[in-house]
Amino acid sequence: TVKRSSKRGWWGPPSNCWVCTGFNKCCEHESHCMTFPTQYNRECK
């Protein structure tokens, strides 16, 4: 299922959307994903 991201874009992933591993966060690129406090809690930079 495709869910609306709490940030921007879509969890899917369409173009411009990188799903951060371990959490359904949608970022523009993998390098925008950051981890805190564990690898299962990710947000966009």
UniProtKB/Swiss-Prot annotation:
Keywords per UniProt: Disulfide bond, Knottin, Neurotoxin, Secreted, Toxin
Propeptide: 1-2
Disulfide bonds: C17-C27, C20-C33, C26-C44
Protein name: Conotoxin Cl6.14
Presence of keyword Disulfide bond: yes
Any one Gene Ontology cellular component term annotated for this protein: extracellular region
Tissue and organ expression note: Expressed by the venom duct.
The record's note on its domains: The presence of a 'disulfide through disulfide knot' structurally defines this protein as a knottin. The cysteine framework is VI/VII (C-C-CC-C-C).
Compartment(s): Secreted
Species of provenance: Californiconus californicus
GO MF, one example: toxin activity
Keyword Secreted: yes
